[in-house]
Amino acid sequence: MIHHIPNVLNKEQVAEFRKLMEEANWVGGKVTAGTLSASVKRNQQLSEQDPLTHHLSDIVIKAIWQNPLFQAAALPHKIIPPLFNRYDEHESFGFHVDNSIRLIRGTAEQIRTDLSCTLFLSEPDEYEGGDLVIEDTYGYHEVKLPAGDVVLYPSTSLHEVSSITAGTRFASFFWVQSLVRDDSKRHLLFSLDESIRELRKSHGDSYSEVMKLTNIYHNLIRMWSEL
């Protein structure tokens, strides 16, 4: 399931990110690509060792851990520290699948990539082309969101960033190991969580059905989660 998570960063944070990123030193994006995907990757990234990467990454991590919609959709267990990229004119990243296992930067710890995330840092009208195209069982989905918004989708999906024809596309990208690895189970839990939240709004926390459904939700988490 593809999720749109709005306003992960506010406009002031985005403006500060952009100021710092536009003055930064960029390296070729192939450094974080697998052998196969490197052949179709043409973009630029902030170095993983750059202090700016660490600074911006910490802000993104704090924002997503505090975002209730992200928590409900991803059920995150571990998060790869975010990286940052830019696509200038004629740059793109052809169809590829993300590596199934990745190292957490600066450690020997590995995580399973269940969910891929893109945090948009350019407004849609600042560049042409550059859509994130995600392929799933229902076809192709073209994604271009406002700056500060996140798209969250299963890492099993083939996806690409189409060629930039004008302007520059700035973004952050990262991966999540979920408490629940199966996408269909996460979808079910998210739908159940949505129903509980709507019932709480309309009937209050003391409504008996809220308590019953909350009990079911947490028992399913116990049944399906991996720690």
Curated annotation (Swiss-Prot):
<protein>
    <recommendedName>
        <fullName>PKHD-type hydroxylase A1S_0473</fullName>
        <ecNumber>1.14.11.-</ecNumber>
    </recommendedName>
</protein>
<keyword id="KW-0479">Metal-binding</keyword>
<keyword id="KW-0560">Oxidoreductase</keyword>
<dbReference type="GO" id="GO:0006879">
    <property type="term" value="P:intracellular iron ion homeostasis"/>
</dbReference>
<dbReference type="Pfam" id="PF13640">
    <property type="entry name" value="2OG-FeII_Oxy_3"/>
</dbReference>
<keyword id="KW-0847">Vitamin C</keyword>
<feature type="binding site">
    <location>
        <position position="169"/>
    </location>
    <ligand>
        <name>2-oxoglutarate</name>
    </ligand>
</feature>
<feature type="binding site">
    <location>
        <position position="159"/>
    </location>
    <ligand>
        <name>Fe cation</name>
    </ligand>
</feature>
<feature type="domain" description="Fe2OG dioxygenase">
    <location>
        <begin position="78"/>
        <end position="178"/>
    </location>
</feature>
<dbReference type="Pfam" id="PF18331">
    <property type="entry name" value="PKHD_C"/>
</dbReference>
<dbReference type="InterPro" id="IPR041097">
    <property type="entry name" value="PKHD_C"/>
</dbReference>
<dbReference type="GO" id="GO:0005506">
    <property type="term" value="F:iron ion binding"/>
</dbReference>
<dbReference type="InterPro" id="IPR006620">
    <property type="entry name" value="Pro_4_hyd_alph"/>
</dbReference>
<dbReference type="InterPro" id="IPR044862">
    <property type="entry name" value="Pro_4_hyd_alph_FE2OG_OXY"/>
</dbReference>
<feature type="binding site">
    <location>
        <position position="96"/>
    </location>
    <ligand>
        <name>Fe cation</name>
    </ligand>
</feature>
<keyword id="KW-0408">Iron</keyword>
<dbReference type="GO" id="GO:0016706">
    <property type="term" value="F:2-oxoglutarate-dependent dioxygenase activity"/>
</dbReference>
<dbReference type="GO" id="GO:0006974">
    <property type="term" value="P:DNA damage response"/>
</dbReference>
<dbReference type="InterPro" id="IPR005123">
    <property type="entry name" value="Oxoglu/Fe-dep_dioxygenase_dom"/>
</dbReference>
<dbReference type="GO" id="GO:0031418">
    <property type="term" value="F:L-ascorbic acid binding"/>
</dbReference>
<feature type="binding site">
    <location>
        <position position="98"/>
    </location>
    <ligand>
        <name>Fe cation</name>
    </ligand>
</feature>
<dbReference type="InterPro" id="IPR023550">
    <property type="entry name" value="PKHD_hydroxylase"/>
</dbReference>
<keyword id="KW-0223">Dioxygenase</keyword>
